[in-house]
Amino acid sequence: LSTGQVMDKIDAKGYYGVFNIKRLFVRKAQCHFGWDWAPDMPGYGICGDVKLIGCVKNRISDVHYRAYNSGKLSIFVDLNYTVREHMTEDKQIRQCDPECANDILRYVVATRPDSPISEGNGVVFETKVTGEKNFANFTIDNPELWWPNGYGKQPLYDYKVQLVRGGKVVDERVGRFAFREIALCQEPFDRTHMKYCLQVNGVNVFVKGSNWVPAECFIGGIKTEKYLRLIDEAARANFNMLRVWGGGLYEKDVFYDICDSKGIMVWQYLMFACSDIPEDDPEFVETCQKEVVFQVCRLRNHPSLVYWCGGNEKTGSYWHKITKGDYFVDVIMRGTVNNYDGTRPYARQSPCSLTDVGNDVTSGESHAGSYERSLIDGVLNYRNKVSDTGVMFVSECANMGPGTIEIYKRMFPEDKLWPMNEYWRDRLMENPYSEFKVPFCERQLLYADTLYGESDTLRQFV
């Protein structure tokens, strides 16, 4: 069945969500069902790489690590088999494969960053497999710490884990790790406000960045070169964080690899956005748990990932007192994330606060920005708006920019390119939920005219 055919059968009565209520039940990028910046085109099919990998039956299933600024490092290895024979009083309940009885795990860890493992740059440790779960500890002298963009360098160390059977390497995992520690500081600021501050290696970080939504509407077409260009532009603009938005998708490995090397911290959403969550549907909850376990295990080795978030603008953000999904994000998802990671802060949603209103500016982080409001009311009021808002951490603030001239030429007939007209209003997206009832094209023109002076031509506007 196509995505549309599946959705036709969904009964979403009693739930709240923006743009498309039935999307709640479909585990797919939510923005594919239409957003104020994305068309309603829910394609279906395989959108990532497909590989056929030959492997042995008994092998490594996962490797993850924990690194500490002291230089201590633990590498954890999960296998898809055991070498233990578990016994009860009257019977054996698990038989190990005899060929695996003498398996060995070989750990190789670089002692210097940003250089390959070699005879002069690596510590080797071998030990017998102890069961499905195994680990080994190391200490690296004078470790070089990983820092966000603008705060220092991003040294990355190589590691390798090999499964040795009968003197031969039958499976291997390689990766990179970094020494850095993350904390979220929430302490009293004054009598009525609580701080919300991210700390890296014990240092308060002034977070600067933006949302990251899928770089193409059809995500299968995103090339590595585009990830490199966009993330490099973010770094050169002095960003230090990208917020992988909950209405999009868990990004490809290459995205996180580039962020690791560029010092771009990643705020990683679980993929829920702007709606209730049907926590009363057991099948839905089970599916989501499997999804989150897979993604946490896939992403937890990236030093750039510093923050987990249970979803974007769940219904508590809309000043609703009764919402569906609180237990899901507060308990089920929090427990799942902490069980499989536990080294990073987890927030129930964004925005979040310590009161019963998610978008309360007195604590937590808020989407109550002052930028757009000040432009609507007059840019001379900007400083007053900033002061009046009094928010502790602004995690999202809607902003608009133009397309390219080439894009506009593909969108509009030659005689409709400029000035703005009914074609612009028809072919640019809109947000019916916005409190500012100004078409997006006219809002963009307002931004341009207010900040840079009146635009007489399309080129001036762009």
Where would I find each of the regions flagged by the language model?
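Active-site mouth of glycoside hydrolases
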Residues: 5-10, 15-24, 30, 40, ...
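Generic recognition of flexible, low-complexity loop/linker segments
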Residues: 37, 146-147, 295-296, 380-382
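Substrate-binding clefts and catalytic carboxylate motifs of secreted carbohydrate-active enzymes
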Residues: 41-45, 308, 379-462
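Secreted/periplasmic carbohydrate-active enzymes, especially glycoside hydrolases
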Residues: 1-242, 250, 261
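Substrate-binding cleft/loops of secretory-pathway carbohydrate-active enzymes
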Residues: 322, 351-392, 402-406
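Long, contiguous hydrophobic alpha-helical segments, chiefly transmembrane helices and signal peptides
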Residues: 35, 46-47, 210-212, 244-245, ...
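Active-site rim elements
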Residues: 34-38, 320-323, 456-462
